[in-house]
Amino acid sequence: MPSSLSSCESMRETRGIKHLREERSRRANAMKYVEHSRRVFLETGTRFPREVIWAVGVVKLAAARSNVSLGLLDGGIGSAIQRKAKEVMKGLHDDRFTVDVFQTGSGTGLNMNANELIAELASRDLRGKVHPNDHVNMSQSSNDVGPTAVRVAAAYATERQVVPSLRKIARSLRTLSRRTSATVKPGRTHLRDALPVTMGQEFGAYADAFERDARMLSESVRYLFELPMGGTAVGTGLNADPRFGAMVSREISKETGLRFVPARDRFRATRLLTDVANLSGGFRTVSLDMYRLCQDLRLMFSGPYTGIGEIDIPSQEEVAGSSIMPGKTNPVTVESALLASAEVIGLDAANQFAASLGEFELAMGVPLIGYNAVVQARLLSEALGKLATVVIDRVVPMKERGRMLAETSPALITVISPRIGYDKAAALGKRIAHGAPIRTALRELGYDERQIDSILDMKRLVRPGIPSKRLRGAG
């Protein structure tokens, strides 16, 4: 009896191994391009992000619908392709997109990965042959699919991820600006004491910057709405119905909620990705603004005893700042955003160079630009969102500290400079910088206590005007 059981188990195991081998063989035959590409593309392990795979699925869905509507593709095959394209959009087959980002410059590897995968899945459904080129890639070329998918992915990520995050942090900064509108602190230029400002004015400046950035990106992304679909290999549209490009653009618009249209010049949209490079430059601009905000936050948070110490950020206490110094708190979220800024700026440099690759009819940096643009969008969306909720919304102004620093700043001498002259004021400022109390220095100039109180009235000093006009007698 045991021998018989062992024999049955052995047979089942043998059949299982045979089935696995057949499945591998079937997949290899179905995915010939992908399998062969491993030998000639780079194998860095850098795979396309979810957004790019989703965008390719959108393009294949739109193309199948359009080809069926035009009477070019059998309805049954077209329906199967659409079902599987939707599965690709949902992320059900992300593990099957195995081509490396560092591949042929046109993105043919990405397009053929989608074609072969969808054909294999659709064939299994229909129990018949769906061809990756004849059916899934009908009326298309990698040369219009790649640039289209890159634009769809980058535009969607910008509109649905980055712009909302920009608006979110701008709202948070506006709220913080109002909350700290009466919190006076020293201004600083060249990291040296300058005239006083309010904390609200400083944060309001960044709110305005991010509001402007949101408008700038929304304007830049409009140029990505022109798609080269229907241009096929070189932009002429050979082997595609003249109506195909417009139909695909409409279908992509339905799926994304964005207003994609056929490119005014398909030759331009096929050979140049400078519209995506321009968007990448916009991401760089956002990163620069975010970097400046983070640098200021770090300095204002520095301390608690040997730094500026004008704000506290309690959320940063949620993780230990040091593995050796107990109780140390570091601006960890802020520094995470600084790293994201550096990466986005670096990826933009790669994009500007990649956008110059290619000759004549075709762009040759398609897969890299698509990958980088989506990664840039991810980084910015995450960093801006975290900064808003974890840092900006939880800033605690150290009001007394800020006022004390502002009231002892030698820069306050600027108030009386119009009355006593620049040279005399500069000499007085040096005395104060070397330890002379500002009130004592002002008394020596002949100002009484009422006038000194007026000079040191911080509320007047953070508004436009010439306060010294109101002073009498001294100088």
PLM feature spans:
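Conserved, well-structured ligand/cofactor-binding cores
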Residues: 2-475
